[in-house]
C-alpha cells in the first residue's frame, strides 16, 4: 500500500488550482457553472407529497405506509434533469441549484414571502409566479394545521410558544429529521434489490405483528421508489445519448444510462458505479427527509475497495478518479436550504452541510489513510466550494506525519477546508458514551462537527439549542427573561442583592440551567413523538444497522445507538461574564475594581452608559477564558461539568441520552446582534464568540488559547465542539506546512478535540465586506462549516473580521487596527 500511496501522490502533484482548466476541463466547467447559477425554489416534492396525502386522508392506511407511498410515488414520477456534463446521474431537485420545499416542517415560513423571496436583498431564492400560486392555493393550505410544529402545538402549546420566542431554546425537529450518517456501504454491497427482498421476507415472517409488518412493508414500498427513480435516470440518459450530437456528451449520457441501469439496484462493481449508487441514495434520503446534514460519511473507506481495484487494473486513471470524485462534490452542492427572510439573520449563508470524513483509523484501530484519501484531499484543494463539508480525522500515533502535513497543505492552499478531528479524544469520548470500541472507531463527522458511528447512531445531533446568555440573564434577574414579562419564567431564584456569596449566584445559574434543560427536553421529546406518528423514515431506516433487524423505524429507536444532541450558544461570553462577576463582586483582594452584583447588573442593563471605566476593566483586565487565568480555567470547567450533569443522563423519546456540544453555525452572530450587554464587558448587539472559541481580540499567545480549550474535559462534550482559529495568510511552503501540522498535533496531544481554520487577514475580510463584487467566491470557515463570505449576514461578517488573528510562524496575536485608531 505504501508504494501505491507514493505513486498516487506523485501523480496528484500534477494538478493544482492554477492549472484546473488545462488539466481537468470538466471540473473547471462544472465549477464555473456552479458559481453562476442562482438558488431556485423547487416545489415538485411538495406537490407530490401533498397530493398523495390528500387522496389517502381518510383511507385508514397507517401513516407509515401512506408516507412511504407518497415518497415512492414522488421518486417514481419526478422529472429527470441533466443540467451540465456531470458524470453522475441524479439530482436533489429539478433545478441546477435547488431549494426544496418541505411543507411538513417549516416550509410554510416562506408563505408571506412568495411574492418577494426572489427579490429580497439577503440571498434571494428564485420562485416563479406559477409555482408560487401552487404553493399558495394547493400546497400550503393543506399543511396549515398539519405541519409538525402545529401538531406539537396541539399537545404542548405553552412550550411551543416559548420555542417561537427564539431566545429560550430552539428545537430543530421543527425543521428537520437529519444530522446523522447513513451506512451507504450496505447499498453498495447488497444493492437496493437485496434490501427490498429482505423486507419482503421479513414482512411475511412477521405478518402477525402489525407494527413490524407495517415497517417492512413501508421499506418495500420505499425501495421500489428508489429503483424506479434510478431506472428513470437510465432511460432519460439513454434518450439524451440518442439525440446528442457532441461525442463527449453522448458518451457521458451512455455511461450514465449504463451505470444507473445497474446501480443502486445491484451491488456496485467499480468506482463510478459505487459513487453514483451512493449519490442516488443521498438524493432519495433527501426526498424522504429534509436536505440538512445528512452525511455521506467516510468516503475514503466506503469507496476504497472499488477505487483500488479499478486503479490497480488500469481501468481508472488518477484523472478519471478526480473527475468522478469532483462530479460527486458538485452533486452534493446542488442544493441549499429554503430560508425565510427572518432566518437569514441566524442562518444566512449556510449550505446543506453534508459532511465528508477522511482519514483516521479503521475498526481495528490501525491507520486507515489510503490512496483514495489523498485523491479526495486533492479534490478538496481544487474545488473551493461551500459543500461538502470535508473533515480530516487524525490519530497522532497511528496516522503518519505525511498525512497530517497533506491535510495542513490543503488548508493553507484553499484557506478554509478541511477541519481537523482528534481520533484519540473522539473515539474515547464515544466509548465513554456506551459505544463499542469498534463502532466508535468507525465514527464520521455529522453536519458541523458532531460525532456518530456510521449507520449505527441515529444521533439527531442538532436537536436542541441552548442560548446560555438567556440562562445567565434569568440567573441575574430572578428568573425573568426579556421576552416573557415581569414574572419569573420557570422559578424565582433570587435577585442580585440576595447573592452575598459567589456560590449562591452559581446555584441560581445552575438551577436556571436545569429548568431550561427540563423544558427543552420535554418539548424535544414531544416533537420526537410526533415525528414517530407523522414522519416515519423507511428509506433512511433501510440504510442503517438495526432497523431491519428490529423491525422498527429509525425514529422509533430502531438504530443501535439513539442519542440526541444539545448544543450551546455563547459559552465563551457567558464564561467570561461569570468570571467577571466573581472577580468584581466576590473577590475581596481585587483592589482595581469592586462593586456589588446589583451595581454590576444595573450597569450591564444600561449597556455601560456612564460606566466607561468599568467597561474597560471588564474587557481588558477581568479574567478571560483562553488566557489560562486560574479563575477562567475553573469557571470554564465548571460550566462544562454543569451542562454535562444536567443533560447526559436524560432520556430522549427513542431511549437514548442527550449529548452536550458547543458549536453554533451562525447563530452566535445572529443572536448576539439582538442581545443586550453582558458582564464580560461585551456591549449590546455585538456578535457572540463562535462555538467554544475564546472571545476575539484577547491579547494572548496562540498556544495559550489552544491549551485552554484542550484542557476542557472532552469526555463531557460528547457532541463535540467547534474551535475556530484565524491565521495570517501564509503560503503552503514546506516550512509553513510543517509548522501548521505540528501546532495541530501539539494541541491534540494536550487533549484538543477539533480545530478549524481561516487563512485570512483582517484587511481582506474588511475589503470583502466593503467591495463584495471583488470577492464573489471568498470561502470562509464559520462555526463547523464553510460559507461564501458575501452570502453571510452583516453580523456574521463582522464576527469573522474581528476574530483574533495569529501569525503562523510566531504564534503571536495580531491585533485588529481599525481606520482612525
Regions found by a protein language model. Name each.
Residues 2-216, 248, 252-255, 259-821:
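Conserved catalytic cores of very large enzyme subunits
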Residues 217-228:
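Extended non-globular scaffold/tether segments
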Amino acid at each position: 500500500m505504501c508504494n501505491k500511496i507514493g505513486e498516487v501522490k506523485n501523480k496528484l502533484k500534477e494538478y493544482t488550482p492554477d492549472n484546473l482548466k488545462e488539466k481537468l476541463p470538466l471540473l473547471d466547467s462544472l465549477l464555473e457553472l456552479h458559481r453562476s447559477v442562482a438558488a431556485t425554489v423547487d416545489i415538485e416534492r411538495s406537490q407530490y407529497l401533498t397530493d398523495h396525502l390528500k387522496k389517502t386522508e381518510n383511507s385508514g392506511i397507517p401513516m407509515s405506509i401512506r408516507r412511504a407511498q407518497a415518497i415512492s410515488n414522488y421518486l417514481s414520477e419526478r422529472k429527470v434533469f441533466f443540467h451540465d456534463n456531470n458524470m453522475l446521474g441524479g439530482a436533489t431537485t429539478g433545478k441546477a441549484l435547488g431549494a426544496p420545499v418541505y411543507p411538513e416542517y417549516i416550509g410554510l415560513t416562506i408563505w408571506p414571502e412568495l411574492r418577494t423571496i426572489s427579490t429580497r436583498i439577503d440571498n434571494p431564492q428564485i420562485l416563479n409566479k406559477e409555482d408560487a400560486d401552487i404553493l399558495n392555493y394547493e400546497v400550503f393550505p393543506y399543511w396549515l394545521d398539519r405541519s409538525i410544529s402545529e401538531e406539537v402545538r396541539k399537545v404542548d402549546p405553552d412550550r411551543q410558544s416559548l420555542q417561537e420566542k427564539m431566545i429560550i431554546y430552539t428545537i430543530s425537529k421543527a425543521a428537520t429529521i437529519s444530522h446523522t450518517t447513513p451506512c451507504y456501504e450496505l447499498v453498495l454491497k447488497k444493492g437496493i434489490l437485496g434490501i427490498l427482498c429482505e423486507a419482503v421476507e421479513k414482512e411475511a415472517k412477521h405478518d402477525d405483528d402489525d407494527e413490524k409488518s407495517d415497517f417492512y412493508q413501508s421499506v418495500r414500498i420505499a425501495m421500489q421508489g428508489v429503483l424506479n427513480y434510478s431506472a428513470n435516470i437510465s432511460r432519460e440518459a439513454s434518450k439524451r445519448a440518442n439525440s446528442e450530437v457532441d461525442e463527449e456528451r453522448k458518451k457521458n449520457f451512455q455511461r450514465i444510462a449504463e451505470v444507473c441501469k445497474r446501480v443502486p439496484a445491484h451491488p456496485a462493481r467499480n468506482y463510478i458505479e459505487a459513487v453514483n449508487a451512493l449519490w442516488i441514495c443521498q438524493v432519495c434520503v433527501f426526498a424522504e427527509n429534509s436536505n440538512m446534514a445528512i452525511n455521506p460519511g467516510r468516503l475514503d473507506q466506503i469507496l476504497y475497495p472499488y477505487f483500488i481495484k479499478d486503479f490497480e487494473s488500469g481501468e481508472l486513471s488518477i484523472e478519471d478518479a478526480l473527475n468522478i470524485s469532483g462530479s460527486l462534490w458538485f452533486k452534493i452542492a446542488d442544493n441549499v436550504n429554503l430560508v425565510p427572510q427572518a432566518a437569514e439573520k441566524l442562518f444566512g449563508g449556510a449550505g446543506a452541510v453534508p459532511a465528508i470524513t477522511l482519514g483516521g483509523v479503521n475498526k481495528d484501530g490501525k491507520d486507515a489513510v489510503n490512496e483514495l484519501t489523498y485523491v479526495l484531499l486533492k479534490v478538496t484543494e481544487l474545488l473551493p466550494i461551500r459543500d461538502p463539508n470535508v473533515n480530516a480525522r487524525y490519530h497522532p500515533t497511528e496516522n503518519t506525519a505525511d498525512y497530517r502535513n497533506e491535510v495542513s497543505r490543503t488548508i493553507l492552499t484553499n484557506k478554509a477546508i478541511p477541519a481537523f478531528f482528534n481520533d484519540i479524544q473522539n473515539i474515547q469520548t464515544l466509548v465513554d458514551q456506551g459505544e463499542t470500541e469498534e463502532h466508535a472507531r468507525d465514527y464520521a463527522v455529522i453536519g458541523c462537527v458532531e460525532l456518530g458511528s456510521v449507520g449505527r447512531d441515529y444521533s439527531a445531533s442538532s436537536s436542541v439549542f441552548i442560548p446560555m446568555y438567556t440562562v445567565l440573564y434569568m440567573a441575574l434577574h430572578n428568573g425573568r427573561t426579556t421576552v416573557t414579562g415581569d414574572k419569573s419564567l420557570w422559578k424565582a431564584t433570587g435577585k442580585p442583592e440576595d447573592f452575598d456569596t459567589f456560590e449562591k449566584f452559581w446555584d441560581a445559574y445552575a438551577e436556571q440551567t436545569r429548568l431550561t434543560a427540563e423544558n427543552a427536553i420535554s418539548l424535544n421529546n414531544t416533537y420526537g413523538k410526533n415525528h414517530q406518528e407523522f414522519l416515519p423514515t423507511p428509506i433512511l431506516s433501510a440504510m442503517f444497522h438495526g432497523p431491519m433487524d428490529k423491525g422498527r423505524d429509525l425514529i422509533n429507536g430502531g438504530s443501535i445507538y439513539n442519542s440526541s444532541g444539545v448544543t450551546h450558544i455563547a459559552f465563551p461570553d457567558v464564561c467570561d461574564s461569570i468570571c467577571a462577576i466573581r472577580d468584581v463582586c466576590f473577590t475581596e483582594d481585587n483592589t482595581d475594581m469592586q462593586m456589588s452584583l446589583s451595581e454590576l447588573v444595573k450597569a450591564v442593563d444600561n449597556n455601560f452608559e456612564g460606566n466607561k471605566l468599568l467597561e474597560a476593566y471588564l474587557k481588558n483586565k477581568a479574567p478571560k477564558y483562553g488566557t489560562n487565568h486560574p479563575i477562567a480555567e475553573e469557571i470554564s470547567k465548571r460550566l462544562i461539568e454543569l451542562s454535562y450533569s444536567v443533560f447526559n443522563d436524560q432520556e430522549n423519546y427513542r431511549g437514548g441520552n442527550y449529548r452536550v456540544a458547543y458549536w453554533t453555525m451562525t447563530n452566535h452572530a445572529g443572536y448576539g446582534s439582538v442581545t443586550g450587554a453582558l458582564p464580560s464587558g461585551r456591549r449590546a448587539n455585538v456578535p457572540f464568540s463562535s462555538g467554544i472559541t475564546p472571545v476575539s481580540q484577547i491579547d494572548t499567545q496562540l498556544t495559550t488559547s489552544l491549551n485552554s480549550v484542550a484542557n476542557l474535559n472532552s469526555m463531557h462534550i460528547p457532541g463535540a465542539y467547534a474551535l475556530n482559529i484565524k491565521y495570517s495568510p501564509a503560503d503552503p511552503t514546506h516550512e509553513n506546512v510543517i509548522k501548521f501540522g505540528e501546532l495541530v498535533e501539539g494541541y491534540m496531544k494536550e487533549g484538543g478535540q477539533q480545530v478549524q481554520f481561516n487563512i485570512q487577514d483582517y484587511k481582506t475580510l474588511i475589503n470583502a465586506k466593503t467591495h463584495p463584487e471583488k470577492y464573489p467566491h471568498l470561502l470562509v470557515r464559520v462555526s463547523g462549516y464553510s460559507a461564501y463570505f458575501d452570502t453571510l449576514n452583516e453580523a456574521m461578517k463582522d464576527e469573522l473580521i474581528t476574530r483574533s488573528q495569529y501569525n503562523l510562524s510566531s504564534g503571536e496575536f495580531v491585533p485588529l487596527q481599525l481606520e482612525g485608531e
